[in-house]
Amino acid sequence: MARTIDLNADLGESFGPWRMGQDETLLELVTSANIACGFHAGDPDVMAETVRLAVSRGVALGAHPSLPDRQGFGRRPMALRPDEIRNLVLYQIGALAGFARAAGGRLVHVKPHGALYGQAASDAAMAEAIAAAVRAFDANLILVGPAGSQLVRAGQAAGLAIAREGFADRRYEPDGTLTPRGRPEALIEEPAEAVAQALGMVERGEVTARDGTVIPMPVDTLCLHGDGPDAAAFARRLRMELAARGIPVAALGGWLSGAA
């Protein structure tokens, strides 16, 4: 049987009446939702509504904690102590878990956002602080991070189940990190190329870096960015291609076992 893959999207990133992304449409296409917890985007009303919609569609709930940086959308690196990282992650997980419980759902995973995700990929102390926060809240939660990263290693060391994430529409560097968003070639804008990259990670566990190097990239979940105008169309196309290859799509909590 073909291996199973999860499809996730970063959602709940609106503020008040200002709308961002295509959350309602994407919730019909993805299996897991990473929901902003107020530190880079979202607010209590948006969090509550996004959780409600996800629960009503059977989409797995995930907390998407960030560094405290609304102006920079959580994408600016910060130098914080490990205890500060642990506390801000724990705070945000707890906030989203409250909305999940109120809506009759439960948290399944935690995926850091933006600079928190990027820094923790290579910073062992930051990664360990994030893993400690997740374990302290609920040792049954799945920690999502890039394959081969310090974040994944920290999750395994903490005894957590981990999910290795790949990005369909982002280019990679030869060391396996994402090409910085500031570079003009950071995003893959041609849908066919993005689909091919996603299939390469799922079927062969590899990706071609920006310089042409083929590097290992085994994945359990693929991130589909929801803020582009063609996000929903791309998600439909990818699901169709996966189905054509007999690759099941399902939320992490339904099939991913503990990896530690």
Swiss-Prot record:
Record-linked SUPFAM superfamilies: Glycoside hydrolase/deacetylase
Species, as recorded: Methylococcus capsulatus (strain ATCC 33009 / NCIMB 11132 / Bath)
Protein name as annotated: 5-oxoprolinase subunit A
Highest rank taxon of the organism: Bacteria
Similarity comment: Belongs to the LamB/PxpA family.
InterPro entries: Glyco_hydro/deAcase_b/a-brl, LamB/YcsF/PxpA-like
Enzyme class, broadest EC rank: hydrolase
Catalytic activity: 5-oxo-L-proline + ATP + 2 H2O = L-glutamate + ADP + phosphate + H(+)
GO process terms (BP): carbohydrate metabolic process
Listed EC numbers: 3.5.2.9
Role played: Catalyzes the cleavage of 5-oxoproline to form L-glutamate coupled to the hydrolysis of ATP to ADP and inorganic phosphate.
Quaternary structure and interacting proteins, as annotated: Forms a complex composed of PxpA, PxpB and PxpC.
Segment forming the signal sequence: none
GO MF annotations, alphabetized: 5-oxoprolinase (ATP-hydrolyzing) activity; ATP binding
Alphabetically ordered keywords of this record: ATP-binding, Hydrolase, Nucleotide-binding
